[in-house]
Amino acid sequence: MKSSFSVVIAGLALVFCVPGARADIGINPRVGLLGYGIEISAGVSDRLSLGVGFNNATRKRQGTTEGVDYEYDLRLRSGEVMANFHPFAGAFRLRAGALLNRNEFILTGRPGGSGTYDFNGTTYTAAQVGTLTGKLSFNKSAPYLGLGWGNRPNGSWGVTFDLGAVYQGKPKLSLEATGGTATPPTLAANLEAERQQAEEDLSSFKWYPVIQLGLYFRF
């Protein structure tokens, strides 16, 4: 979290050091698949602005991976530095930049309906496994490409819309079972095989879609 704030602070310093940028400042609160966020931008010309922002949200989901039920605590936290190019000096814009990506899934395993887990073809009771936890994380530096509408330099106020994608790389999965009664080496080996297979199943999740809707005010 502190790293995300550091990116925003450094980005603000860079944006406001751009010659002529102080004359046109935009504030853009928004909500979308990156969470609740805000961007502060400075117009460099009638077609270009530079912005920094921060996104944050927590969401809970449930699902099944490799036959194991999980509760997912999705933590969305990212800082961003963006360039917004308005090719026609109007509302339409092309958008590119980078995120300091702290997005992650915190996983808590739940036994199936029979009260058991199945790891790598071996069945364990809930008592044998104990507490099953994990984390799904991504590249910390993630480029962004997209297009959007609104928040043009020298504008006044209005609605913004963004559609794009973040390249976050292959997900990295960790799993750990603690406090159980199963023989540690055997459980650890099967849990590692389960982790590798689940990570492979998730390997195509390299791009994170971005849809955002917000308001902008420029002064």
State the predicted function of each range.
Residues M1-I9:
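Bacterial N-terminal signal peptides that target proteins for export
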Residues C17-V18:
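N-terminal signal peptide c-region/cleavage motif recognized by signal peptidases
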Residues I25, Y36-I38, L48, R77-V81, ...:
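Hydrophobic, lipid-facing positions within transmembrane beta-strands of outer-membrane proteins
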Residues I27-L33, V52-N56, L94-R102, F161-Y167:
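Transmembrane beta-barrel strands of outer-membrane/channel proteins
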Residues V31, A42, F85-P87, A98, ...:
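Residue-level signature of outer-membrane beta-barrel architecture
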Residues F54-V81, N103-S141, G169-V210:
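Extracellular/periplasm-exposed beta-strand and loop segments of Gram-negative cell-envelope proteins
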